[in-house]
């Protein structure tokens, strides 16, 4: 069975690994991963990696399930020898609001979810309500190299090439896995897919131990300041620009992030800036995770689409990888059935 995976962010690599681990032992797979960007140059590398879905219920209930599956999988890996290399760790912190809001759908997924006490709220005078919980941190800059190593150990080939069309890789391939994120629209028109530009500042601030996410409904999602400590640096953010394709770091956005994060946590004024990155979240009303049979002139192929994970790719990736593997299994079953001789009963 010949498989072409397009895209080498967290979605492409995890989907490839999940499928290879599940089916290669019984159905030898010849798998290639095509991408014009591999780690450390993917959108996933820019992400701070905090496991937290959006606050509102997803339009597709399956997305809540996929996020939960990802949390459960990562939690099961937490005490494995691989956790440190994966960039996986527990992390606790705050979600802050101006006014009281309903509890999120994921409150029972995370550990120790509770409302903030009045004395805790005194720490954040600009906010009137909040939550505290323990979650998981999965840093893309560690996790993507770890996934890549697992795949190459299994004999999966990585091909550094920009794929211009699905037809380009269809010849001689049984299944195409489309994990191209925000660039999926270049391979197949998708009016629902848009870039959600983000910009972050990375600082050295080892005294910051808790994440702090703020939420302002009037500004929209991701447009409020957030602070997420990682293993080596702290990520500062708060930019979400729908439809903006500019890959350049913006001085204006830098100033917005710096001013708002320093107001939220004044000790950051003493932090040394060590990096600044811009990336594009693949924004869609819901994840596209489905099969499609495509014909390309004389050739044809099964396609599994897995893209449109917005700003929560690391939060939902393994659940989506398992669902893509389920779809792949159905393709295998159908191919086996089609090869069976006709019954003469």
From Swiss-Prot:
Q: Where is this region: Active site lid that may open upon substrate/product migration in and out of the active site and close to increase the hydrophobicity of the active site, to make the hydride transfer reaction more efficient?
A: 214-226
Residue positions annotated to bind D-proline are 226, 281, 311
InterPro entries assigned: D-amino_acid_oxidase_CS, DAO, FAD-dep_OxRdtase
Binding annotation for FAD: 8-11, 36-37, 42-44, 48-50, 162-163, 180, 281, 310-311, 313-315
Q: Where is this motif: Microbody targeting signal?
A: 343-345
Post-translational modifications reported in the UniProt record:
Phosphorylated in the cerebellum; probably not by PRKACA, PRKCA or PRKCE.
Q: Which GO terms describe its biological process?
A: D-alanine catabolic process; D-serine catabolic process; digestion; dopamine biosynthetic process; killing by host of symbiont cells; L-leucine metabolic process; neutrophil-mediated killing of gram-negative bacterium; proline catabolic process
Report the superkingdom from the record: Eukaryota
- Cellular location(s): Peroxisome matrix; Cytoplasm, Cytosol; Presynaptic active zone; Secreted
Q: Which family does it belong to?
A: Belongs to the DAMOX/DASOX family.
Miscellaneous section: Transgenic mice overexpressing the amyotrophic lateral sclerosis-associated human DAO variant 'Trp-199' exhibit lower body-weight, progressive kephosis, and a significant loss of motor neurons in the lumbar spinal cord is evident at 8 months; the effect is greater in females. The DAO 'Trp-199' transgene also potentiates the development of disease in the transgenic mouse model of ALS overexpressing the human SOD1 variant 'Ala-94'.
Q: What does this protein do?
A: Catalyzes the oxidative deamination of D-amino acids with broad substrate specificity. Required to catabolize D-amino acids synthesized endogenously, of gastrointestinal bacterial origin or obtained from the diet, and to use these as nutrients. Regulates the level of D-amino acid neurotransmitters in the brain, such as D-serine, a co-agonist of N-methyl D-aspartate (NMDA) receptors, and may modulate synaptic transmission. Catalyzes the first step of the racemization of D-DOPA to L-DOPA, for possible use in an alternative dopamine biosynthesis pathway.
Q: What is this protein called?
A: D-amino-acid oxidase
Q: What is the lineage of its organism?
A: Eukaryota, Metazoa, Chordata, Craniata, Vertebrata
Gene that specifies this protein: Dao
